[in-house]
From Swiss-Prot:
Its EC number is 3.6.4.13. It is an enzyme of class 3 (hydrolase). GO terms for molecular function: ATP binding; ATP hydrolysis activity; RNA binding; RNA helicase activity. ATP binds at G139, E140, T141, G142, C143, G144, K145, T146. Residues 935-998 form the Tudor domain. Belongs to the DEAD box helicase family. DEAH subfamily. The gene is spn-E. Probable ATP-binding RNA helicase which plays a central role during spermatogenesis and oogenesis by repressing transposable elements and preventing their mobilization, which is essential for the germline integrity. Acts via the piRNA metabolic process, which mediates the repression of transposable elements during meiosis by forming complexes composed of piRNAs and Piwi and govern the methylation and subsequent repression of transposons. Involved in the repression of LTR retrotransposon copia. This is Probable ATP-dependent RNA helicase spindle-E. GO terms for biological process: meiotic cell cycle; oogenesis; regulatory ncRNA-mediated gene silencing; spermatogenesis.
């Protein structure tokens, strides 16, 4: 690499500052609860239509007029392009090329199938092809045109021994393959010789030189023509199924017409379709001398098809309003009318005698196909049919669904005959229009509706719109009957509406879908600007759509912002990235994913994810199935919180299964178990292989390091999410908490229980004596498969809530798989909340209050005091608890067992004598005589003696290990040490009654601990677990003997502690070693810490007796409500019904868009996403967390609801959103606070026009507010990464390949990895989030000085960011802040009336002393104190 460019990032040299504007902040108003009316207003957009088309079309007509007239064309045949010697030969009449040797080599049978309708037009077709450059053939499905017309051409070549090379396009891969195989079978040719196929890069061409008839997909031919820029490799080009008007087909027509008019005038083009608009196509290819002839090969049907409309169905009284062309949809009355139609059909067949068929025979042959627009409508129709079945027992039917997301088993069910006595009713979307033919369908009910995907090119948000179907669609649907017998079609609209209002043809894909790939093809073709090329389309798009597409391509790095150095809003020079994207059969963002995968050396992972996002239906549709189906998303996501990671893991599992040679039946069972589609996975596998081959051809190969630069799975997971964030910029969303302000409400709603383990129901009645129904509440979770013994059910005192807390039991029932979920939250919480999506109302039968009171009195359950029931409870002797006293700050003792830094057990040295005495008592030979002889005597929860380190200690049985029945072992937990061991019966002893009397109720002589104020660093943490190195440091400390703990807080009997070292403490050391990062303690912990500090400050003024009393009250308050698991009353006594709502969680959260186009919209997550149940996975952490969506769709009346699809929760690394934005955005503006002492927000986008100061792409401008410190050195590191990413594919103008070689790539990868690691592992100070009203305003970045140097100039995809200079905070301001801080500490122990005040360091309004105390404990305030130099105790 150029040394001068490398010196640009040499940190040993002086950092020269460049002046830049001191811009002010913009912010995501929703994410930080800031109101701004301006942001709620929609962006004003100027839509430019099709006036631009006229001039380009006229020029093209002049070219078309140069095509030779028919008498000139008659004797001509093509040379191959390779035979041409000069451009002049294009204008000359080419010599006739013979191919006699080829024709002698293969057997040619000239007897064609005369029974096919197309045969009658054979001579007419051949003559038309010989006499015209373009011929249009219209023929119904089944007439034989696809297989026969190319053979007719080839047969003519055989007769005259003239050279033929025919290519035939098909819109679908499977069609190209099956038709080629059928032709080979018919002609008795070996596959891949005379006739073959090519789909993607997959070819069946055994002898490529001999192939004269090639069937391929539309995209394959388009790529060939774009690369060759001529048609002359072929003599005949046959475009089949032209009516489908896919985007590739429309652009292929542009290319063919242009090449016909320039350098390929002697190639023959044949356009074929069943429902073609011949006049439109004929006009498109016409010149001033002639127009292409249209040959109609339609034929009459052998069976009649009767069509009926809504107003013709006299026996059905259709009530309600008339159809509205502007309001497509199905009313309840519409569904009911369809049901009535079905009943009429059934009744008609019961009474029909003239056909001579029995009713059972009519049932077999009389299946009904109902065309519905989508899966939601299929579900509604299904529900209506079920209701009908419940009320009408005469008619029996078998319901079958048919849509694109079906599993293979469901697809097969469509073709299976219904059981005897049952009528088959198929409910289908438009997938059944042409792809599927079911032989036994005799009736069609058509609502004349469909759902079509439209994309708003301004925002790039897609929406699935419900529209009226075209007449062409309706005719295709009607064509599903009348093939084997007479049929009937019932259209659920009036005849006049059908004839007058429905359009003849559907909206072409080019007018409703993204145009990125077409624009890239136009740039690769180099025959005009994208605007010029797309103006020549059969249906040209709006100019504004083309310009918006150009902006999108500039955003993803496919185009440079300029053309020959000049900015053009409707054009841009193609980048090497764009060249790669044009070669990949993917959406441009997925191609960007592969490019970034190559740069970050995660190429194969990127290919797999891109393929998985392209192929639909990998997971069987889970919206109507149980929670077990949805839970499989979690199984494969494996705690990543990413649908994309889930796709990657699904594929790896599938690949492993294939490599192990799993039998077909076993594969089907595997797919059923995990609710996967083998068909979709097989298609995905083909695409993965295709993409790998394409990448290899593009020289995109992974680096094979001797030792991987990524040290472990956690770092790989981070890097994978980095490229996901980079690929799908700017689809960035900020996760917001359900509780605003502090996290107090999070705990108050659930009465102080652990929100990471607790869900709750509402609408319960406090007078109902809820403790009687705990077992019934536990039975509300059948679909979740959560064992009742893993739940504690408690009730809010005086509230209408029921709390369900899931136990921290690390041992799962046998046969279950442990599933990782993001963060600290229990998997059962996700399962319970997902239950609400299927049913949010749960019935609970209870007794009447007076009957219940009598019941508990009679059964002597608890006590009744003054008419109020007090449930039974287990008494706790708080004076015997080993928990730390409220007055103790420092405790010395031993760490007896370590699970991790987040869970270990501590034994205070004050209990050493007690432990020694107990051990001596337990190990008395007399006590060890009670050997266990019967394994059945040992049950879960039993207290006994178990052997530990050579001595017996008291333990409780956790569970029985039944894996080995001959040698039963038991998992036991040592009560006074905290560890769990798996022991045989020989190492267990039953406790005598004397021992049980003394020690059964004695609390453990230890307490559980976790490290305070720190959490695992995401860069080294998998599943939010503490890294092994951190645990090893704690183990080493424990082995040293006595340990000194500083108690921070005690919450739910778990102490948050700091472990003192000779210098500092372990908590700080872990942060320094980057194994942990600083974090806030949650609200309950801060409350307890504040209470403990105040009690400890007055310890010297309180007597020993009073201290003991206060501590007992303190410990008693720490005990949680108990679930006594009472037996419920008899069902016959429970006569009242309560409808519970829920379950809910206080951790539920929503997301808000950072993009301007999404600011005023409601944002939801796709129900099929692993993040549909979105929770705050680190509730104590106040940092903004980012969610990235692979795609976004809009819905709602005004498209004001966004649905995020294929989402990924980004790592919980402070500043991650800001860092990703700065690395991957095209251009950014760093905004400083008013004092210019720190950066407070980032405005990112395509930039602005230097004269007008207007944003180039306002819709996609986004703002990230900073809640942690990002400094100048961080931006310099980011610039280094951007420069290195540019270096990978940088090529000089005119060069075809990048200049970076393999050695350069290794250097680049190492530099990127090191810089990124430094950025993401840096411990950052918290800063005040500082939103202002001047959002999304670009400042002149050059008015205050020279811009930063750009190493690659205008050929840079990632230009360097300007780094505004920061200043030290004004000393007077600092002194004011220190005074304000001192004032707050003076108020800390204030007991009188308090006037609300503001913490000026944090800009936090404080209404009470208690709020002030807790605020002083937040990490934000502590960091700000350190920043201003306030002396802290």
């Amino acid at each position: 690499m150029d040394q001068e460019l490398m010196d640009f990032f040499d940190f040993s040299k002086e950092f020269v500052r460049k002046q830049a504007p001191r811009g002010h902040v913009s912010s995501n108003v929703h994410a930080f609860v800031t109101e701004s009316e301006e942001l709620e207003k929609p962006i004003k957009r100027e839509i430019v239509g099709k006036d631009y088309v006229k001039s380009f079309v006229e020029k093209e007509k002049e070219r078309m007029n140069g095509i030779f007239s028919s008498d000139e064309m008659a004797p001509m045949r093509n040379k191959s392009l390779d035979d041409m010697d000069s451009d002049e030969e294009y204008e000359a009449s080419p010599e006739i090329r013979t191919d006699a040797e080829f024709y002698e080599k293969y057997y040619f049978n000239l007897n064609r199938d005369k029974s096919l309708p197309i045969y009658a037009k054979r001579e007419e077709i051949i003559n038309a092809i010989n006499e015209n450059p373009v011929v249009i053939v219209k023929g119904e499905t089944g007439c034989g045109k696809t297989t026969q017309v190319p053979q007719y051409i080839l047969d003519e070549g055989f007769k005259s021994k003239q050279y033929c090379n025919i290519v035939v396009t098909q819109p679908r891969r499977i069609a190209a393959i099956s038709i080629a195989n059928r032709v080979c079978q018919e002609r008795q040719w070996q596959r891949g010789t005379v006739c073959g196929y090519q789909v993607g890069l997959h070819r069946q061409l055994e002898r490529f030189a001999d192939t004269r008839l090639l069937y391929c997909t539309t995209g394959v031919l388009l790529n060939i023509l774009v690369n060759n820029k001529t048609l002359t490799h072929y003599t005949h080009i046959v475009l089949d199924e032209v009516h489908e008007r896919g985007q590739e087909m429309d652009f292929l027509l542009i290319v063919i017409r242009r090449l016909l008019a320039t350098n390929s005038r002697h190639v023959k083009v044949i356009l074929m379709s069943a429902t073609i608009n011949p006049r439109e196509l004929s006009d498109y290819f016409a010149n001033e001398r002639s127009a292409p002839p249209v040959i109609d090969a339609s034929y009459g049907r052998n069976f009649t098809v009767e069509k009926y409309y809504r107003d013709q169905l006299q026996t059905i009284n259709w009530e309600g309003h008339q159809e509205d062309i502007n309001s497509p949809g199905i009313t309840q009355e519409g569904y009911r009318s369809a049901i009535k139609t079905i009943l009429v059909i059934d009744n008609m067949e019961r009474n029909e005698r003239s056909t001579g068929k029995s009713y059972n025979q009519s049932l077999r042959e009389g299946s009904i196909l109902i065309f519905l627009p989508g899966v939601g409508e299929i579900n509604n129709m299904s529900d209506m049919l079920k209701d009908m079945a419940n009320h009408d027992s005469i008619m029996k039917f078998n319901m079958v669904r048919c849509h694109s997301l079906m599993s293979s088993d469901d697809q097969r069910e469509i073709f299976q005959p219904s059981p005897p006595g049952y009528r088959k009713i198929i409910m289908a979307t438009n997938v059944a229009e042409s792809s599927i033919t079911v032989p036994d369908v005799s009736y069609i009910i058509d609502f004349c509706l469909e759902k079509v995907l439209f994309t708003d090119t301004f925002t790039n948000f897609s929406s699935l719109r419900l529209v009226w179907a075209s007449k062409t669609n309706c005719r295709q649907r009607a064509g599903r009957v009348g093939r084997l017998r007479n049929g009937r079609v019932y259209r659920m609209v009036t005849k006049s509406f059908y004839q007058r209002e429905l359009s003849e043809y559907s909206v072409p894909e080019m007018l409703r879908s993204p145009l990125q790939n077409c624009v890239l093809k136009a740039k690769e073709l180099k025959m005009g600007t994208p605007v010029e090329m797309l103006a020549l389309a059969l249906s040209p798009p709006n100019l504004s759509d083309i310009c918006n597409t150009i902006l999108l391509l500039k955003e993803v790095g496919a185009l440079f912002p300029t053309v020959d150095g000049t900015y053009d809003p409707c054009d841009g020079d193609i980048t090497y990235w764009g060249t790669i994207m044009s070669k990949l059969p993917l959406d441009t963002r997925l191609s960007r994913l592969i490019i970034l995968g190559y740069i970050f050396n995660l190429l194969d992972e990127a290919i797999i994810i891109a393929a998985g996002l392209t192929v639909r239906g990998i997971f069987v549709d889970s919206t109507r199935l149980g929670s077990d189906n949805y839970w499989m998303h979690y199984v494969f996501a494996d705690g990543s919180g990413s649908d994309l990671v889930g796709i990657w893991r699904v594929y790896l599992t599938y690949l492993n299964m294939c490599e192990n040679g799993l039998q077909k039946d076993a594969s089907i069972q595997w797919a059923k178990r995990f609710h996967l589609s083998l068909r979709a996975l097989s298609e995905m596998n083909l695409l993965v292989l295709d993409l790998r081959l394409r990448c290899e051809k593009l020289s995109l190969l992974p680096l094979n390091f001797p030792i991987s630069r990524i040290s472990d799975d956690s770092e790989k997971a981070i890097m994978l999410k980095v490229i996901i964030a980079g690929s799908f910029y700017p689809n960035y969303f900020v996760q917001s908490k359900s509780t605003s302000g502090d996290d107090r409400n999070m705990f108050s709603v659930i009465s102080g229980l652990d929100p990471c383990r607790t869900v709750y129901f509402t609408s319960f009645t406090d007078r109902t004596m809820g403790e009687l129904y705990t077992r019934k509440v536990k039975q509300l979770f059948p679909e979740t498969q959560i064992p009742p013994e893993n739940m504690d059910v408690t009730f809010g005192q005086g509230s209408e809530k029921i709390f369900v807390t899931f136990k921290n039991d690390i041992y799962k029932p046998e046969g279950t798989t442990y599933v990782h979920v993001p963060g600290r939250i229990k998997a059962e919480v996700y399962k319970a909340l997902r239950l609400r999506t299927y049913c949010n109302h749960h019935s609970l039968r209870v007794m009447e209050p007076m009957s219940a009171l009598k019941y508990v009195k009679d059964k002597k359950i608890g006590k009744v005091v003054e008419g109020r029931w007090i449930p039974p409870s287990k008494p706790v002797a708080v004076e015997l608890l080993a928990l730390p006293s409220v007055f103790d700050k420092i405790i010395v003792g031993r760490i007896t067992n370590i699970v991790s830094c987040g869970k270990f057990f501590f034994q205070p040295e004050s209990f050493e004598n007690c432990i020694a005495n107990m051990s001596e008592h337990f190990n008395n030979p007399q006590q060890l005589q009670n050997c266990v002889r019967n394994a059945g005597a040992i049950t879960k929860g039993l207290m006994l003696l178990a052997k530990r380190q050579g001595k017996y200690q008291r333990a409780t049985v956790v569970r029985v290990d039944t894996q080995n029945s001959s040698n039963v072992r038991f998992y036991v937990r040592f009560v006074d040490y905290g560890d769990i061991e798996r022991l045989p019966m020989t190492q267990l002893r039953l406790m005598s009654q004397d021992l049980l009397r003394h020690y059964r109720d004695l609390p453990p002589r230890l307490f559980e601990c976790r490290l305070a104020l720190v959490q695992p660093a995401s860069m080294v943490s998998t599943y939010n677990a503490w890294p092994q190195k951190a645990d090893d440091m704690l183990h080493a400390l424990a082995k040293g003997g006595r340990v000194q703990l500083e108690i921070y807080s005690l919450v739910q009997n778990v102490a948050a502690v700091m472990i003192h070292l000779r210098e500092g403490n372990l908590n700080e050391l872990l942060v320094k070693e980057k194994l942990a990062r600083r974090t806030n303690e949650d609200y309950m912990s801060r409350v307890d810490h504040d209470f403990r500090m105040r009690k400890q400050e007055c310890r010297g003024y309180v007597s020993q007796q009073e201290r003991q009393q206060v501590n007992e009250e303190y410990l008693r308050s720490k005990q949680l409500p108990q679930d006594m698991d009472l037996s419920p009353p008899p069902p016959q006594e429970c006569k009242s019904l309560i409808i519970l709502k829920g379950p809910f969680s206080t951790l539920e959260s929503t997301v808000f868009s950072t993009m301007q186009s999404g600011m005023s919209k409601t944002v939801r997550i796709d129900p099929c996403s692993v993040n549909f149940v979105l929770l705050d996975t680190e509730p104590q952490d106040q940092h903004a967390k980012m969610v990235v969506a692979a795609s976004i769709s809009s819905a709602g009346r005004h498209n004001d609801v966004l649905t995020l699809r294929s989402t990924s929760i980004m790592p919980n690394i402070p500043g991650f959103a800001a860092i990703m934005t700065l690395i991957f955005c095209p251009r950014a503006q760093l905004n400083a606070n008013t004092a210019n002492s720190r950066y407070v927000s980032i405005l990112a986008g395509l930039g602005y026009h230097p004269q007008t100061m207007k944003s180039y792409y306002e819709d996609h401008d986004l703002v990230i507010n900073l809640d942690v410190n990002i400094d100048e050195h961080d931006v310099l590191l980011i610039n280094q990464i951007r420069y290195m990413m540019d270096s990978v594919f940088f090529n000089l103008e005119g060069e075809l390949r990048p200049i970076a070689g393999h050695a350069d790539r290794v250097l680049i990868h190492d530099t990127i990895y090191r810089a990124l690691n430094r950025l993401l592992s840096k411990n950052r100070n918290f800063i005040v989030c500082n939103p202002k009203s001047s959002d999304y305003v670009w400042q002149d970045m050059e008015e205050s000085g020279e811009p930063d140097p750009q190493p690659y100039g205008r050929r840079s995809i990632f230009p360097m960011h300007t780094i505004p200079e920061l200043h030290e905070e004004n000393m007077d301001t600092v002194l004011d802040l220190i005074a304000n801080c001192k004032e707050m500490y003076d108020y800390r122990n204030f007991e009188g009336s308090f006037d609300p005040m503001t913490c000026r360091l944090c800009k936090q309004y404080l209404e009470s002393v208690s709020e002030l105390r807790l605020h002083l404990l937040t990490q934000l305030h502590l960091d700000r104190e350190k920043e201003v130099g306030y002396p802290m105790d």
